[in-house]
Amino acid sequence: MSAKVNKVVLAYSGGLDTSIIVPWLKQNYGNPEVICYCANIGQDDELSGLEEKAIATGASKCYVEDLREEFVRDFLFPLLQSGAVYERTYLLGTSVARPLIARRQAEIALQEGADALAHGCTGKGNDQVRFELTYMAFAPHLKVIAPWREWNIRSREDALDYAAEHNVPVTATLKSIYSRDRNIWHMSHEGGILEDPWNEPEEAMYTLTTDPEAAPDEPEYVVIGFEQGTPVSVNGKRLGPVELLLTLNDIGAKHGIGRVDLVENRLVGMKSHGVYETPGGTILRVAHQGLEQLTLDRDTLHYKDVIAHRYAELVYYGQWYTPLREALDAFVRVTQRNVTGEARLKLYKGNATLVGRRAAKSLYNPDIASFTMSDSYNQKDAEGFIKIFGLPVKVQALLEGRSRGER
């Protein structure tokens, strides 16, 4: 038996892993009081009966908090504004959720007078880092228990056997081959046939989005309104953060929007293969990018791409509660001052195509950009600009003797 703890707060989902962790903690840590904590960030029916299940498993109580509003407003929308995408593809749905869940878990632990925190993350994954960095930020003195790094359970079969031996009620079976994570932003799928990156995902695996081939044969247009980079309306109707994202999820899912297949580099050093569904998030990303094209000057837009890359790494690595993230957010907020307007998208069989954008403070001037001659832009001025801009190229050529045909 490990060192005794008196009270532990467990990050709890009600799935197979966290269900068996409850009796395992009691068995291996001196029969502590186990309090379960679950954040509602958009799992929908996965939350049904969760409190009763936790208590039946041996927990003394189970907190279930609706954090959807905070999640969308304070995590997803800043992520959207930053432009962060991990390794060109992943919209960071799982990564960005962990800091909020772990922070509230730590706060509950302090409120309850617990002396330990526990999570069900595997020793091979990124989530263990995300949870524990957050614990360090909010409850650095509490003991952290990570059963997957301690116990002898090595497979789904082992976990099901343990559940049966300890009378833990679970709905999981050996046929449930995929490891999934769901919230209001996305659904992820790993494991099963995806462990071979050559395998095409089975259509039956997808749970949020329609097969693009079976999507409507007529395109649908959607207009997203933004105020200083924050989405506020859909097709002219003003909506709160949660309702707006749920609306776009429904619209996007119908048209098969937001499916990606990615082999990614995990923080812990290995590569993993996952499939993600992010219908509403994909629509918002395309719309937001389109509006930034109008409202950001070239230097700011290009440098923001650099920031976006680092922001994505920061979120993926679990470094949300750091001075760097606060500093990057401050930069991003300045860039969003004029990102107010509308973007129009055409949704058709898996594609979200930007087909229109307008903004009150647009930097696009049709009088200057037009191919027709006007007094707004003297094309003769380009001659001097080219000479100055190209001077380093000319000097290098003269140095190497190119002007005389030398080689």
UniProtKB/Swiss-Prot annotation:
GO terms for molecular function: argininosuccinate synthase activity; ATP binding. It is found in: Cytoplasm. The gene is argG. SUPFAM superfamilies: Adenine nucleotide alpha hydrolases-like, Argininosuccinate synthetase, C-terminal domain. This is Argininosuccinate synthase. ATP binds at A11, Y12, S13, G14, G15, L16, D17, T18, S19, A39, G120. It catalyses: L-citrulline + L-aspartate + ATP = 2-(N(omega)-L-arginino)succinate + AMP + diphosphate + H(+). Pathway: Amino-acid biosynthesis; L-arginine biosynthesis; L-arginine from L-ornithine and carbamoyl phosphate: step 2/3. GO terms for cellular component: cytoplasm. It comes from Roseiflexus sp. (strain RS-1). The lineage of its organism: Bacteria, Bacillati, Chloroflexota, Chloroflexia, Chloroflexales.
